[in-house]
């Protein structure tokens, strides 16, 4: 049985880790910490958990002695500092601290300088692309939610060289839980309900993460124009991507089917069928659809994920399964909740 710790257990990604790990047949939660709610029972914070375990302060020695792997679900800059105290434990970080190859890029976009950053010690945790590296990693930087939806949707097209990469336009819609569990006016009911708005236009922190990984896939520089929008729903991301191509829709669709054949969580939809966030709700599944705008030679790709599962906690557990040589789908077999 894998002994698991969750640092930052009371945020939305933390509680999603708890929900998924409680039904994982090969994992046991032995440690949970919360800076805000230390000393309280989990069920005092989330009554739905029925969990009597008491949340603790961060204790590096206790984690090192009692855990085989720790999930860190913390603000930018915090995970890296705490992870440096945990030298004998596998770490899966759901924040941004271990996603970047170049610490200067991270510092530029997140405003935090990571001292003594060793990019060779960490692996970018997108299983469909890097499972062989993840298997032997000690530290995994779990991808961001938007990058997950965009990278998976673009990878087959970029790898096959059938699209232009100088300008890729991405329009994404996300549920409010993507902003985290915090008291902010912009995310109150009256501000969000019956409202749709863009945010962080042309300056979202996920852009350099997308470009870093897409460059590796394409083998050359990739530029992404990214506009995220907040929509009045709890979970889900729908990304619509526009990219130029000379290939036929049938050829592109065949490339995608072949690339993702055998992947347990990525589903390429039949032509004429387009994804819905409702199909992913509460699950680790990804749905990808496509259409060709023939007048302009524009390939329109669409992907849907649950931002808290495949976009965060579910993908983190998928990475854990790989790191411990388990079946990749273990603990993640649940179908989406519908309706």
From Swiss-Prot:
It catalyses: N-acetyl-L-glutamate 5-semialdehyde + phosphate + NADP(+) = N-acetyl-L-glutamyl 5-phosphate + NADPH + H(+). SUPFAM superfamilies: Glyceraldehyde-3-phosphate dehydrogenase-like, C-terminal domain, NAD(P)-binding Rossmann-fold domains. GO terms for molecular function: N-acetyl-gamma-glutamyl-phosphate reductase activity; NAD binding; NADP+ binding. It comes from the Bacteria. Its EC number is 1.2.1.38. Belongs to the NAGSA dehydrogenase family. Type 1 subfamily. This is N-acetyl-gamma-glutamyl-phosphate reductase. It comes from Thermotoga neapolitana (strain ATCC 49049 / DSM 4359 / NBRC 107923 / NS-E). The lineage of its organism: Bacteria, Thermotogati, Thermotogota, Thermotogae, Thermotogales. The gene is argC.
């Amino acid at each position: 049985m894998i002994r698991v710790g969750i640092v930052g257990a009371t945020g939305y990604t933390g509680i999603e880790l708890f929900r998924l790990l409680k039904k994982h047949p090969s994992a046991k939660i032995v440690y949970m910490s919360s800076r805000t709610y230390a000393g309280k029972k989990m069920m005092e914070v989330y009554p739905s958990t029925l969990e009597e375990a008491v949340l603790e302060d961060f204790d590096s020695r206790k984690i090192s002695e009692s855990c085989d792997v720790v999930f860190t679900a913390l603000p930018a800059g915090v995970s890296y500092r705490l992870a440096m105290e945990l030298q004998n434990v596998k770490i899966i970080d759901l924040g941004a601290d271990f996603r970047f190859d170049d610490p200067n890029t991270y510092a530029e976009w997140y405003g935090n300088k990571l001292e003594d950053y060793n990019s060779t010690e960490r692996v970018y945790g997108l299983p469909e692309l890097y499972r062989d590296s993840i298997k032997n990693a000690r530290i995994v930087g779990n991808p961001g939610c938007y990058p997950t939806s965009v990278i998976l949707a673009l990878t087959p097209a970029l790898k096959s060289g059938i699209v232009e990469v100088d300008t890729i336009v991405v329009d994404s819609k996300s549920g409010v839980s993507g902003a985290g569990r915090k008291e902010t006016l912009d995310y109150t009911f009256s501000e969000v309900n019956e409202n749709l708005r863009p945010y962080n236009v042309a300056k979202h922190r996920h852009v350099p993460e997308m470009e870093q990984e897409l460059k590796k896939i394409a083998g050359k520089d990739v530029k992404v124009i990214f506009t995220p929008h907040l929509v009045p729903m709890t979970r889900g991301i729908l990304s619509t991507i526009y990219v130029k191509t000379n290939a036929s829709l049938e050829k592109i669709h065949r490339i995608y089917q072949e690339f993702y054949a055998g992947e347990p969580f990525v589903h390429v939809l039949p032509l004429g069928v387009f994804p819905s966030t409702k199909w992913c709700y509460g699950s680790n599944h990804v749905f990808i659809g496509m259409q060709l705008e023939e007048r302009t030679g524009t390939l329109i790709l669409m992907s849907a994920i649950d931002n808290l599962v495949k976009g965060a906690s579910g993908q983190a557990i998928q990475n854990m399964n790989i790191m411990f040589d388990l079946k990749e789908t273990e603990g993640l077999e649940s179908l989406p909740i519908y309706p």
